[in-house]
Amino acid sequence: MKHNYKKYLLWLLLFLPACLMAQNKEEKMPGHITKVQKLEDVNVTGNRPHFIRLKGYYRSYQTNDSVMKYFNDGIVEYYINLKNGKTDLNAYSKRNLHNSRLVSEDKKRAFMVSDKGTFRPWPEEKTLIEQYRKKYQLKDSLGTQLVLLNQQKIGSIQTDSTRNICQIEINQLPTYKNLTHQLFGYTQTDIYDHVVEAYQISPEDYYSFKDLLFQKSDNSYLFSHKKDKQQQLIHVITELYITEKEYVEKKQSIKQDSSTPKESAAAITDFCNSNKIPALPEATEQEMQQLTPYNPANMKEIKE
């Protein structure tokens, strides 16, 4: 039995990543720069400001065995401290949705490890370009810089001088020391992890989160408890679109968001339309519309 399980797991690890990449090759490894809105140039006059404020929209959604289980999105403001690089967040018009049927089917155990993989992006510390320029070899190739690990391509850095945009794409899986993690009888095996960041080009060829335009992570993993008969294939996509940036002297606090789910949905729709945020694929949008609002503090559903 153990031999068959190991054989099955090995087959999944070998076969599924290839399937996922083949089915979504254009989306996951596009080979071209993502269509993002170029922001207006921001000039600094007078004293050096303390913060840069980035405003934008994020969405993060998860499928379990190809059925949507969680969807979270909202409008965000990041205040990046220009001295130490630390980031503070204001979030409003937040929307938290889940598939009540799938959530109700989660088995309650003495030690629960949630399968929830959605998250709110947090641009802080080092960008992908900063990390990978220091850690790995870069090689020029036909106007593109290839990112190499042990002479194998794991990503690329592309520049569009016409639009003044630079983009880095990385397949992070080859950089992992361990693909399998275990806790309280649960096992998670990573099988795909692809990230993208796009920046406005800076004159000094240095990219920090103050130049960020777009960020995306796309990852898949197998998840199960030791008592489960089979593993679930979990797929999580998280995107962040920056729509405004400005230098400011201090952070602005906002009142706690008391919007109802309907009010948040309306505000998010208006914001996305006004800022030309790319729409979800039609099938994904339809699945999202079937989900139920919930309170992330206690996971209870919100009745309107």
Show where each model-derived region lies.
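Bacterial Sec-dependent N-terminal signal peptides
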Residues: 1-28
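Surface-exposed, low-complexity/disordered segments
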Residues: 24-304
